[in-house]
Amino acid sequence: MQAFRQRIRQTVPEMRRVKQIHFVGIGGAGMGGIAEVLLNEGYQVTGSDIAESAVTSRLISLGAKISFSHHAENIEGASVVVVSSAIKGDNIEVITAHEKRIPVIQRAQMLAEIMRFRHGIAIAGTHGKTTTTAMVAMIYAQAGLDPTFVNGGLVKSAGTNAYLGCSRYLIAEADESDASFLHLQPMVSVVTNIEPEHMETYHGDFEEMKQTYVNFLRNLPFYGLSVMCADDPVLMELSSQVGRQVVTYGFSDEADYRIEDYQQTGFQGHYTVVAPNGERIDVLLNVPGKHNALNATAALTVAKEEGIENEAILTALAEFQGAGRRFDQLGQFIRPNGKVMLVDDYGHHPTEVNVTIQAARQGWENKRIVMIFQPHRYSRTRDLFDDFVQVLSQVDVLIMLDVYAAGEQAIAGADSRSLCRSIRNLGKVDPILVSDHKQLAEIVDQVIQDGDLILAQGAGNVSKLSRELALAWGKE
C-alpha cells in the first residue's frame, strides 16, 4: 500500500482572505478531520472542546491551538468559526462570533468548500459509510491517485481519519444526522442504506428524511454518478426520483454489481462480484460479515465506474485493515477462566449491532458471545426499544451499562434498567446491569469462559472501557 505522507500546502486562493479558522467542538472525528486537512493546507487552526482526546492531541501535534473550555476570547483573530452539530446557538463563542460579525458555518459547509474545486466522492447512509469511505480512500491510494480524504473514523492503514493528498480527488463521509450533507456538491455520491435515525432532524417524519436523501443525490451534476445498494428497498423506491445516472450493487439479483458465493472463514470473507459486462471479480476481505462485503462492493463499484484497474481495487481490499472501532480486535487474553478474544465495535443502532453479532457468530463458531453493551442516547433507546430487546437477546451473556446520554436528559422507560427488564422477560438471556464502571472488570471475569468472544458495543465511552480492560489484562 502506498505510504501516506503529510505535506504542507499553500492556502487555496479562493479562501485567501481567510487566515485563521476556529472550530467549536474540535474534538469530534468529523471536525478534527477537516481541521487536519486545513492545517496541512497552511491555515492557522484554533479550536475549543470540553475535554482532551486522541483527536485533539493529534491536532495539537500538527500545530493547532486548542482550549479545553468555551470562552469568548478563544475566537480572537478568527476569520471564520466552524461549529459541530453538537454545539448550540447559546454557546459563548458562537454568540461572540455573531457579535463581531465573524461568519459562523456548519462543519459540512467547510467540507463543501474543500470539495468545491476537487472531484468529490461523498459516501452517505445510515450504516456502513465510515468503512466504505475508508475502503474507497484505500483503493484510490493503491491506484496511485493520492486522494484527500475526510472520514468519520480512523482509517487504520493511514493512521488518521483525514489526509491531504496531491490529486484532485476528495473522498468524504457525508453526514445525514443534521442534514448538513446537503451542502456538498460531489461528482459521485454513494448511499449505503436508509433507516429511520436522527429523526429529530427530520421532525419525526421518515418521508422527509427520504426526500432529503433525494435532494442530496440531486446535488450531483447531470453527468454525475449515484451509487446505491440494491438490497435496500427504500433506496430502490427512491432511485427513479434522483434524475441522475444510478448504478447499484448488492446481493440482489437486480444489482448491477452483484455479489455471489459469499463465504466467511474465521474473520475473513471471500466472494465474487459479477460486473454489468459479465466480468467475474473474486474479492478477499480481512474484515468479517456480509455487511462488509456490501461496503467493499460499494467501494469497488465506485472504483470500477471511475476506471480504476482491478489489481489496485483487489489489493486495497485484501490489505484493508478496517476502520477505527469497527469490529476492532483488541487481542486475545489469558484470564483465570481461560483464553478470550476482546473486540471493540462502534455499532449502536439495532441493525448495526445485529450484523456485528452475525459476523461474530460466523467467525467464532460454537463459541459464546459475551456483549458489553452501552446504549447511546435516551431518544434512540426509546425510539428503537423493541428492536434493541430482540437484537440484544441473541447474545449468550449480556452486560448492560447505563445509557450514554450524549447531552440528553433521561427519558422515563428508556433507560438501561427498563431495557434489561424487557430483555429478561423475553426469556433468552438474563442481562447483568452494571452502573458502576469500576465493577466492570470484576464482573467480566466472573462470567467469561474459555473461548469466549467479548464484544464491547456502543458509541459512548464503552470503547475507552474496553481498552482499559485490554491494558489491564495484557495481551497473550
Curated annotation (Swiss-Prot):
ATP binds at residues 125-131. Its main location: cytoplasm. Pfam families: Mur_ligase, Mur_ligase_C, Mur_ligase_M. The keyword RNA-binding does not apply. Disulfide bonds: none annotated. Its EC number is 6.3.2.8. It is found in: Cytoplasm. One of its GO terms (cellular component) is cytoplasm. GO terms for biological process: cell division; cell wall organization; peptidoglycan biosynthetic process; regulation of cell shape. Pathway: Cell wall biogenesis; peptidoglycan biosynthesis. The keyword Phosphoprotein does not apply. Keywords: ATP-binding, Cell cycle, Cell division, Cell shape, Cell wall biogenesis/degradation, Cytoplasm, Ligase, Nucleotide-binding, Peptidoglycan synthesis. GO terms for molecular function: ATP binding; UDP-N-acetylmuramate-L-alanine ligase activity. It catalyses: UDP-N-acetyl-alpha-D-muramate + L-alanine + ATP = UDP-N-acetyl-alpha-D-muramoyl-L-alanine + ADP + phosphate + H(+). PANTHER family: UDP-N-ACETYLMURAMATE--L-ALANINE LIGASE, UDP-N-ACETYLMURAMATE--L-ALANINE LIGASE-RELATED. Belongs to the MurCDEF family. Cell wall formation. This is UDP-N-acetylmuramate--L-alanine ligase. The lineage of its organism: Bacteria, Pseudomonadati, Pseudomonadota, Gammaproteobacteria, Pasteurellales. The gene is murC.
